[in-house]
Curated annotation (Swiss-Prot):
Transmembrane segments: 25-44, 75-98, 116-132, 163-179
Biological function: Essential cell division protein that coordinates cell division and chromosome segregation. The N-terminus is involved in assembly of the cell-division machinery. The C-terminus functions as a DNA motor that moves dsDNA in an ATP-dependent manner towards the dif recombination site, which is located within the replication terminus region. Translocation stops specifically at Xer-dif sites, where FtsK interacts with the Xer recombinase, allowing activation of chromosome unlinking by recombination. FtsK orienting polar sequences (KOPS) guide the direction of DNA translocation.
An example Gene Ontology biological process: division septum assembly
The protein's name in its UniProt record: DNA translocase FtsK
InterPro entries according to UniProt: FtsK/SpoIIIE/SftA, FtsK_4TM, FtsK_alpha, FtsK_dom, Ftsk_gamma, P-loop_NTPase, WH-like_DNA-bd_sf, WH_DNA-bd_sf
Beta as annotated region, ranges: 944-1258
Length: 1329
């Protein structure tokens, strides 16, 4: 070994030059600056003084102090998130400079310029990628100014995805320019790392210790002892020496075949230059090493390494070779053989070998009485020459049983090669008697023959490992000496230079393996040194004297076909042209060695054609036997309860028929039946008799050999399993057409079978009194029932019910004669409902709130308070959070502003605060009543639902005596908000679609339904959308049906105006000021038993014979769901009616609730707003809409889903309320409860206008005419010119009033409609002089 270099480990202190000292000192300072810069970047706080802001009132939070805060702010502003990489780049540059400080190479300025270009490309593209794909950091752009410029430039041109791809390409080019690395090299490095990781992982999972011999450790110890004195030997030399030693030992193993027998595993136990070794199965057929039929496990394992998958020297055909060695030794007299290589015999021992790990399960096949020839046991000694004794048959043997298919398959072109062999005669010489039995039981793929005495199993045969083995005495036999074959030494084959040569030679030899070469039948001749498998053609099958079973007629054909096929295919297993080796290699282990020919597994059809049965065929045979045993049954299996029920049903029917014959046709088994049922029963009886006749006819005409599953001539094939040659039932059977019953939609088809053939119940259309269900007619009793053979006719009329009723079973309820679906709403349904006993609906109809309430997280609120202070400090606003009020939806933070800070500054920053706090919306409350703080309302992370039941079940609602009490929801503190509609007195509701406006209106209606009786409160509901308020149709509180027509809505409002005038007259007569005082007077008169007569009644006003008396007047609530649609459709007339009601209707007990989703000034005019002070604003789209409703902003910042601002009466500050949620099921439940209490008593004439002319807009001319109308008519008829401007100038009135007068003239027919030029014609004649 050459002398190795030994590194000196001693370190000496050497002085640096002046330039080197200065350079290293400078590098140390730069590294310290990079560390300081990283600390400043990581501890950046927006509230610190920096380049982007100057006002600050807090101590500096940055670890770098004020310079660090300034520098960090500047870097973040320029580079964004890429600023964090700047300290890392600085440290990397210092390391590079320190490593290359001693190199005095020539400076390539072109390379330096390319590196500079690459650095610039990397910086720009990194910032651009961060700006496009990363989130912003603090209040800086994620890519800084550079990334913002690039992203704004690329996005209009390439979009975000295209810009990202373009920047990635430029970044890759910049990396190549800066580093000089090729992307091919980078890809190779990445691939190498991945492969190293996968290799390491796979090596860790594989048992590598099995590949190392025990001798290696000893050899390593020897090497260590030898080289113990070499203390300074390098690690590389030791690894190289170990590798050379392993290679040397591996080569020695290949040279020495007795060491580890590696060639036995790689080349099927043979060398390339050896003669062919012939291995036999237990039946004398040569075993293919790659044959899956004969590649079973060994009975015994050699003393080799059991964990070595490659070098254990055990071929897969060793069990077959051992069996063949013993078999050929005893069958030397059977037939002439050819010389082959001698195989060492297996020594006999007293104790039989253990059972193999894989036990083969024999497949039961058709039994036959023909004896077949079994191979001789292995322990029998060989006989000289060919002196064959007389064959003695003690017991007839059975046909070979095919092993179970899933374990293996035959590995030849012809699937079934199962020849018959002559049985071995009884020998007086005792050998290894147990070997024959063990060979037959253990190696089931080669030979599984048993006598009839042993084969005492039914059709479902037990596995082989469960069968009892015959116990025989085992005579002691001296083991024969093992003869080891001395093979010539040769160089090892496991060298890579011989692979191509071996592969070419092996391809030629393997191609000649499976060439079918017919062998002539040879005469017996003297035995040579080895054995040969006997020819199948030389041993014909012998007829047995035993009785042939009834199944032999069908099996015989398959048996003869199998024997013939085996005779033809016998050369497939012959050993002609088998002089070359048969290598057995493992794929993926070692080099690419010659591979054997792929084996084609026979198909199911090929196996079945030669009589080889599969597990599915055995199951089919089993089913066929069961079908033959149960050929007179219905073919379907039922449980005991179903069979008992059907038997009881049939007995009941027979009993009813007997009683009818005895007592007449009127007897119905103690159950009265109407005439229609009697006719249906008669038709059913005729259908049953007809079915029974057809069944007898088909069962009598069944031919003798029509049974397709008879086992007499059974020959199974995969195609026959799908066919059925037996008679089938007809597809269309004539059925007696029943009488159509008008009240029953469809009755199930009743099929009457014989008593011994019960039918299953059908779950689809089963009736309670009829447990049986349709069954295919004309069922063949001897034919097995299959699901595809049961045909039903959905297009034919259905048979009626049975002719009798069973008393113990309830009768099916008849459906109601209606065409309405049960899921459709029945408005005005007359079905009787159960009347509740309580005066008002129960709260159980509403959804209860959850019992567990999520606690308030005070720690999270404290964190949010600190964050609010920090965000306000970012906008140069000094404020402290002094308190917070958590609610179900939002949390209000009370801010104590610094002196001199205006609340308007925070209000203008509401959207910026929402963005910086990452919330949906922020509402600023400039004035909190009773507190000197400013409120900041933020939404909660987990929003809670406000249930209507928990608001109604409150003392504020229960203790309020007003029948017009309504609940709105909860405020921000979680307290319920209850209002009185009588004090409002009118309500205006506005909100966009989906804001919860309709849900809020439903909550108000339900709260009044839970508070008032129909005699206290009545409703007039106007629903132009025909969706929201139509669900209340039919409740007793309605004065009229829900109004959906716009003209009817105008008439309803006019009726309200007339009712208001009538009530004012009555109140003035009684001397009261409001409806409550009027009702008190009426109640007092009732207590005095002196009712008050109507003072304004005249005898011609009504048909009453007596003078009517005054009664209690209820409150009237007019609800308009979509006020804007009503205004746009009918026009300004509705505005006048609403304005009159809003002005005067409060004292008369008439209240308006107007809801709209378009809060514009042309819908909510100043006249309406002036008379409706109470308003509720849900989420609106803009501040303008918020000011239209509330006269102030704030509604645009609501969260939606019931979040509202409630401006109560006599108050200018709105209260934020979270509306109660009402489900549709709750609304329907309350409505149904009130419908069950009584019907509504509608008032006639509310939606009709009998005094107006058609199409006149529904105006009452006597009451709605202008005071100047008569004078204007006289003026127009005299001048014969109708114009708005003329009337305006003549009477000196406004334009709107003049236009109204002209429209009234048009309505009265005085003037015509406006023409295309704007002129009108005067239709009335001129006045008389």
């Amino acid at each position: 070994m050459s002398q190795e270099y030994i590194e000196d480990k001693e370190v000496t202190l050497t002085k640096l030059s002046s330039g080197r000292r200065l350079l290293e000192a400078l590098l140390i300072l730069i590294v310290l600056f990079a560390v300081w810069l990283m600390a400043a970047l990581l501890s950046f706080n927006p509230s610190d003084p920096s380049w982007s802001q100057t006002a600050w009132h807090e101590p500096i939070h940055n670890l770098g102090g004020m310079p660090g805060a300034w520098l960090a702010d500047t870097l973040f502003f320029i580079f964004g998130v890429m600023a964090y990489t700047i300290p890392v780049i600085i440290v990397g540059g210092c390391w590079f400079a320190w490593r290359h400080q001693s190199s005095d190479e020539y400076i390539d300025y072109f390379a330096v310029s390319l590196r500079i270009i690459g650095v610039l490309a990397l910086i720009l593209t990194s910032c651009g990628l961060a700006a496009i794909n990363a989130d912003d950091i603090w209040y800086f752009a994620s890519g800084g100014v550079i990334g913002s410029l690039l992203s704004t430039t690329l996005q209009p041109l390439l979009h975000s995805s295209g810009g990202t791809i373009a920047l990635l390409c430029v970044w890759a080019a910049g990396l190549t320019l800066f580093t000089g690395w090729s992307w091919v090299t980078i890809a190779e490095k990445l691939g190498g790392w991945i492969l190293n990781i996968l290799t390491f992982a796979s090596n860790r999972t594989r048992r590598d210790d099995t590949w190392v011999d025990e001798d290696e450790y000893e050899d390593d110890e020897e090497y260590e002892d030898e080289n113990h004195g070499k203390q300074h030997e390098s690690r590389r030399a030791r690894i190289l020496r170990g590798a050379l030693a392993r290679r040397k030992r591996l080569a020695e193993k290949f040279i020495n075949p007795m060491g580890r027998q590696t060639d036995a595993a790689l080349f099927s136990g043979k060398r390339m230059d050896d003669d062919e070794e012939i291995t036999y199965t237990a039946r004398g057929v040569a075993a293919d090493p790659d044959d899956v039929l004969f590649s079973g496990n060994r009975a015994t394992q050699p003393e080799y390494d059991e964990y070595d998958p490659l070098l254990n020297g055990a071929p897969i055909t060793e069990p077959v070779a051992v069996a063949a060695a013993a078999t050929t030794a005893t069958q030397s007299w059977a037939a002439p053989v050819e010389p082959v290589t001698q195989t060492p015999p297996v020594a006999s021992v007293d104790v039989p070998p253990a059972q193999p790990t894989v036990a083969w399960q024999p497949v039961p096949g058709p039994q036959t009485g023909e004896p077949v020839i079994a191979p001789a046991p292995e322990g029998y000694p060989q006989q000289s020459q060919y002196a064959q004794p007389a064959v003695q048959y003690n017991e007839p043997l059975q046909q070979p049983v095919q092993p179970q298919q899933p374990y293996y398959a035959p590995a030849a072109e012809q699937p079934a090669q199962q020849p018959y062999y002559a049985p071995a005669p009884e020998q007086p010489v005792a050998g290894n008697a147990w070997q024959a039995e063990e060979q037959q039981s253990t190696f089931a793929p080669q030979s599984t023959y048993q006598t009839e005495q042993t084969y005492q199993q039914p059709a479902a045969q037990e596995p082989l490992y469960q069968q009892p083995q015959p116990v025989e005495q085992q005579p002691v036999v001296e083991p024969e000496p093992v003869v080891e074959e001395t093979k010539p030494a040769r160089p090892p084959l496991y060298y890579f230079e011989e692979v191509e040569e071996k592969r070419a030679r092996e391809r030629e030899q393997l191609a000649a393996w499976y060439q079918p070469i017919p062998e002539p039948v040879k005469e017996p001749e003297p035995i040579k040194s080895s054995l040969k498998a006997p020819s199948v053609a030389a041993v014909p099958p012998v007829e047995a004297a035993a009785a042939v079973s009834p199944l032999a007629s069908g099996v015989k054909k398959a048996t003869l076909a199998t024997g013939a096929a085996a005779t033809v295919a016998a050369p497939v297993f012959s050993l002609a042209n088998s002089g070359g080796p048969r290598p057995q290699v493992k794929e993926g282990i070692g080099p690419q060695l010659p591979r054997p020919k792929r084996i084609r597994v026979p198909t199911r059809r090929e196996l079945a054609s030669y009589g080889i049965k599969l597990p599915s065929q055995r199951a089919a045979e089993e089913k066929a036997r069961e079908a033959q045993r149960n050929q007179y049954d219905s073919g379907d299996q039922y449980n005991d309860d179903e069979i008992d029920a059907m038997q009881q049903d049939e007995l009941a029917r027979q009993f009813a028929q007997t009683q009818q014959q005895r007592y007449g046709e009127q007897y119905q088994h103690d159950v009265p039946v109407n005439a229609e049922d009697a006719d249906a029963a008669a038709e059913a009886e005729l259908a049953r008799q007809f079915a029974q006749t057809q069944q007898q006819r088909y069962s009598g005409e069944q031919p003798a050999g029509a049974n397709p599953f008879s086992l007499d001539d059974f020959e199974f094939s995969p195609m026959k399993a799908l066919l059925d040659d037996g008679p089938h039932e007809p597809l269309f059977t004539p059925i007696v057409e029943p009488v159509q019953q008008p009240q029953q939609p469809v009755a199930p088809q009743q099929q009457y079978q014989q008593p011994q053939q019960p039918v299953p119940p059908q779950p689809q259309y089963q009736q309670p009194q009829q447990p049986v269900a349709p069954q295919p007619q004309y069922q063949q009793p001897q034919q097995p029932v299959a699901p595809q053979q049961q045909y039903q006719q959905p297009q034919q009329p259905v048979a009626p019910q049975q002719q009798y009723q069973q008393p113990q079973q309830p009768v099916a309820p008849q459906p109601q004669d209606t065409l309405l679906h049960p899921l459709l709403m029945r408005n005005g349904d007359s079905r009787p409902l159960h009347k509740p006993t309580t005066p008002l609906p129960s709260l159980d109809l509403l959804t209860p709130p959850p019992s567990e309430v999520e606690p308030v997280d005070t720690f999270a609120l404290e964190q949010m308070a600190r964050l609010v202070e920090a965000r306000l400090a970012d906008f140069r606003i000094k404020a402290d959070v002094v308190n917070y009020s958590p609610g179900p939806v939002i949390t209000r933070f009370e801010l104590n502003l610094a002196p001199g800070v205006k609340a308007a500054r925070i209000s203008n920053l509401s959207r910026d605060l929402a963005r910086s706090l990452s919330t949906v919306a922020v509402r600023v409350v400039e004035v909190i009543p009773g507190k000197p703080y400013v409120g900041l309302e933020l939404p909660n992370k987990k929003r809670q639902t406000v249930y209507l039941r928990e608001v109604l079940d409150n003392a504020k609602f229960r203790d309020n005596p007003s029948p017009l009490t309504v609940v709105l929801g909860k405020d921000i503190a979680g307290e319920p908000v209850v209002a009185d509609l009588a004090k409002m007195p009118h309500l205006l509701v506005a909100g966009t679609t989906g804001s919860g406006k309709s849900v809020g209106v439903n909550a108000m209606i339900l709260s009044m339904l839970y508070k008032a009786q129909p005699e206290d409160v009545r409703f007039i509901m106007i629903d132009p959308k025909m969706l929201e308020l139509s669900v209340y149709e039919g409740i007793p509180h309605l004065l009229t049906e829900v109004v959906t027509d716009m003209k009817d809505a105008a008439n309803a409002l006019r009726w309200c105006v007339n009712e208001m005038e009538r009530r004012y007259k009555l109140m003035s007569a009684l001397g009261v000021r409001n409806l409550a005082g009027y009702n008190e007077k009426i109640a007092e008169a009732d207590r005095m038993m002196r009712p008050i007569p109507d003072p304004y009644w005249k005898p011609g006003d009504s048909m009453d014979a007596q003078h009517p008396v005054l009664k209690k007047e209820p409150y009237i609530v007019v609800l308009v769901d979509e006020f804007a649609d009503l205004m746009m459709t009918v026009g300004k007339k509705v505005e006048e009616l609403i304005a009159r009601l809003a002005q005067k209707a409060r004292a008369a007990g008439i209240h308006l609730v107007l809801a709209t989703q378009r809060p514009s000034v042309d819908v909510i005019t100043g006249l309406i707003k002036a008379n409706i002070p109470t308003r509720i604003a849900f989420t609106v789209s803009s501040k303008i809409d918020s000011r239209t409703i509330l006269d102030q902003a704030g509604a645009e910042s609501l969260l939606g889903m019931g979040d509202m601002l409630y401006s109560g009466p006599n108050s200018t500050l709105p209260v934020r309320v979270h509306g109660a949620f009402v489900r549709d099921q709750e609304v329907h439940a309350v409505v149904q409860d009130w419908k069950a209490r009584g019907r509504p008593q509608y008032v006639d004439g509310i939606t009709s206008d009998s005094e107006s002319e058609g199409g006149a807009g529904g105006f009452d001319g006597a009451e709605e005419l202008d005071p100047l109308f008569d004078q204007a008519v006289q003026f127009v008829t005299e001048k014969r010119k109708a114009s708005i401007s003329g009337v305006q100038r003549q009477f000196r009135i406004g334009y709107n009033r003049a236009a109204r007068i002209i429209e009234q003239m048009e309505a009265q027919g005085i003037v015509s409609e406006q023409g295309h030029n704007g002129n009108r014609e005067v239709l009335a004649p001129p006045p008389f002089d």
